UniProtKB/Swiss-Prot annotation:
It comes from Arabidopsis thaliana (Mouse-ear cress). InterPro entries: 3-ktacl-CoA_syn, ACP_syn_III_C, FAE1_typ3_polyketide_synth, Thiolase-like. The gene is KCS17. The keyword Acyltransferase applies. Belongs to the thiolase-like superfamily. Chalcone/stilbene synthases family. It comes from the Eukaryota. Expressed in flowers. PANTHER family: 3-KETOACYL-COA SYNTHASE. Pathway: Lipid metabolism; fatty acid biosynthesis. This is 3-ketoacyl-CoA synthase 17. It catalyses: a very-long-chain acyl-CoA + malonyl-CoA + H(+) = a very-long-chain 3-oxoacyl-CoA + CO2 + CoA. It is found in: Membrane. Induction: Repressed by herbicides such as flufenacet and benfuresate. CDD domains: CHS_like.
C-alpha cells in the first residue's frame, strides 16, 4: 500500500458502490415485508361484522370482477416469449483458408493493384487483428479471380446450405414446420432472392412469411432477429428461421483507392442460421430466451449516412468505401443505443447515477465533466461485439469500460474467422459456449454496427447451462484459444 492509501481507497470506493447497488436494487423487496406486516396488523384489528359487511357490498363484487377481467386482458395482451432453440455457424473447408502470405501473393499476381496499394493492404492486414486461418471463397483464390454471378451463387449456397443442414440435423425440425423466414445479405441480392433459394432447396411450405433484407450492413443480423420476433408475436405456434451472411465473390475491390481497399483486408467467408420459436413447450429444449432488441438509426445525418458507402472509383471499379469518421460516428450511434437499452437492463442504482450526473452536468453547465457511463457489467454477463475490426472492439472496450475477458470472444472471432459481417455475433456466442462459460440465467448482449449508419442490440438470457452444439465452428480449435495477438 502506498503512503496515500491509494489501493485501499479504490477498494473502499468499489465496496461502497457495490453496497449502494444492492441497496437500491433490492429497496422495494426490503420494504415489502414491513408494509405487509403493517397491512396484516390493520386487517386483524377489524371485527367480524366489518369484514362481513365489506364482503357483501356491491363495491367488493365490482373490485373482484375488475381484477378478474384485468388479469384476463393482461395475460392475453402480454408479448409472447421468443425462444432460441439452436443456431449454427458455417465452417468453410480448409482449402479456402488464406494466410497473410497467400493473400499478398494472390493480390500481387492479380496485377490490378499498384505497389502503393499492395503495401497499404499489407499494413492493414498486419494491424487488423485477423489470424492466418480466415477464409475466402474459391472465386477469390482463383488466378485470375472469378467474380461471376455463378460463382457468387455458389458461394451463397455453400454458406447458407451448410449452416442450415447442420441446424436441421441438430434440432430435428422438419423444414415444412417453419412459418417465418428472414434472410439478410447486404451486397448480394440476386433474382430469385436468397430467401426464395432456401424455400426451393428445403421445400418450405407455400404460405411461409418470407423476407429478404439487403443493403443493411453488418448490423442486419439483429434487425433480422427483431423482424422475426415481431412476426412471431402475430403468428401463433410456429418457428422462425433467421439466416445471416455476406457474399464476397462480386464485392472484392480491384482498384487503388485506399478507403475502398480496407474491406478486402477485413471481410471473410461466414454465415449463420438461427431457429426461433414462440411455442411455450419449446422453452424446455431451448438455449436462450430473447429479452430485448433495440435499434438505432443515424441515417438522417449526412456524415453517418455516407461513412460506409458502396460506390465506383474514378476507374469505375466498384467497392465499399469506409470513411475516416467511421469510429466517431459509431461512438455516437453507440451512445444513442445504450441510452435506450440502459433503462431496460440496468439496475435502478445505475440508472439513478446516470440521471443524477446528467442533471448535474446540465444545471452547472460543466462541459468538461465527462458523462457517467453506466456499468453494464452489473446487468450483462457476456458481450458479443461485432467483430468489424480491431478498432471497433478497442473502442467499445474503452467506452463501456470492459475487461479483456469481456471482449475475448470478439477478438478471437476476428482472429479466427475475420469480419463475417452480420453473422460475427453468432460465432462469438459459439466461442463462449465452446469455452463452457454460459450458465443458466446468464445474460448476453449482442451489439452490431452497420451501414446507414445503424447500431443494434439484442439481449438474451440463458435458460440452462448451455453446451456447444454438434459441429460448433470452434470444436476443432477451441483448445488453442485465446491466443496472444500482437498489435
Amino acid at each position: 500500500m502506498d503512503a496515500n492509501g491509494g489501493p485501499v481507497q479504490i477498494r473502499t470506493q468499489n465496496y461502497v458502490k457495490l453496497g449502494y447497488h444492492y441497496l437500491i436494487t433490492h429497496f422495494f423487496k426490503l420494504m415489502f415485508l414491513p408494509l405487509m406486516a403493517v397491512l396484516f396488523m390493520n386487517v386483524s384489528l377489524l371485527s367480524l361484522n366489518h369484514l362481513q359487511l365489506y364482503y357483501n357490498s356491491t363495491g367488493f363484487i365490482f373490485v373482484i370482477t375488475l381484477a378478474i377481467v384485468g388479469s384476463i386482458v393482461f395475460f392475453m395482451s402480454r408479448p409472447r416469449s421468443i425462444y432460441l432453440l439452436d443456431y449454427s455457424c458455417y465452417l468453410p473447408p480448409s482449402s479456402q483458408k488464406v494466410s497473410y502470405q497467400k493473400f499478398m501473393n494472390n493480390s500481387s499476381l492479380i496485377q490490378d493493384f499498384s505497389e502503393t496499394s499492395l503495401e497499404f493492404q499489407r499494413k492493414i492486414l498486419i494491424r487488423s487483428g485477423l489470424g492466418e486461418e480466415t477464409y475466402l471463397p474459391d472465386s477469390i483464390h482463383s488466378i485470375p479471380p472469378r467474380p461471376t454471378m455463378a460463382a457468387a451463387r455458389e458461394e451463397a449456397e455453400q454458406v447458407i446450405f451448410g449452416a442450415l443442414d447442420n441446424l436441421f440435423e441438430n434440432t430435428k425440425i422438419n423444414p415444412r414446420e417453419i412459418g417465418v423466414l428472414v434472410v439478410n445479405c447486404s451486397l448480394f441480392n440476386p433474382t430469385p432472392s436468397l430467401s426464395a433459394m432456401i424455400v426451393n432447396k428445403y421445400k418450405l411450405r407455400g404460405n411461409i412469411k418470407s423476407f429478404n433484407l439487403g443493403g443493411m450492413g453488418c448490423s442486419a443480423g439483429v434487425i433480422a432477429v427483431d423482424l422475426a420476433s415481431d412476426m412471431l408475436q402475430i403468428h401463433r405456434n410456429t418457428f422462425a428461421l433467421v439466416v445471416s451472411t455476406e457474399n464476397i465473390t462480386q464485392n472484392w475491390y480491384f482498384g487503388n483507392k485506399k478507403a475502398m481497399l480496407i474491406p478486402n483486408c477485413l471481410f471473410r467467408v461466414g454465415g449463420s442460421a438461427v431457429l426461433l420459436s414462440n411455442k411455450p413447450l419449446d422453452r424446455k429444449r431451448s438455449k436462450y430466451k430473447l429479452v430485448h432488441t433495440v435499434r438505432t438509426h443515424k441515417g438522417s445525418d449526412e456524415n453517418a449516412f455516407n461513412c460506409v458507402y458502396q460506390e465506383q472509383d474514378e476507374c469505375l471499379k466498384t467497392g465499399v468505401s469506409l470513411s475516416k469518421d467511421l469510429m466517431a460516428i459509431a461512438g455516437e450511434a453507440l451512445k444513442t443505443n445504450i441510452t435506450s437499452l440502459g433503462p431496460l437492463v440496468l439496475p435502478i442504482s445505475e440508472q439513478i447515477l446516470f440521471f443524477a450526473t446528467f442533471v448535474a452536468k446540465r444545471l452547472f453547465n460543466d462541459k468538461k465533466k465527462k458523462p457517467y457511463i453506466p456499468d453494464f457489467k452489473l446487468a450483462l454477463d457476456h458481450f458479443c461485439i461485432h467483430a468489424g475490426g480491431r478498432a471497433v472492439i478497442d473502442e467499445l472496450e474503452k467506452s463501456l469500460k470492459l475487461s479483456p475477458k469481456h471482449v475475448e470472444a470478439s477478438r478471437m472471432t476476428l482472429h479466427r474467422f475475420g469480419n463475417t459481417s452480420s453473422s460475427s455475433i453468432w460465432y462469438e456466442l459459439a466461442y463462449t459456449e465452446a469455452k463452457g462459460r454460459m450458465r443458466k440465467g446468464n445474460r448476453v448482449w449482442q451489439i452490431a454496427f452497420g451501414s446507414g449508419f445503424k447500431c443494434n442490440s439484442a439481449v438474451w438470457v440463458a435458460l440452462r447451462n448451455v453446451e456447444p452444439s454438434v459441429n460448433n465452428p470452434w470444436e476443432h480449435c477451441i483448445h488453442r484459444y485465446p491466443v496472444k495477438i500482437d498489435l
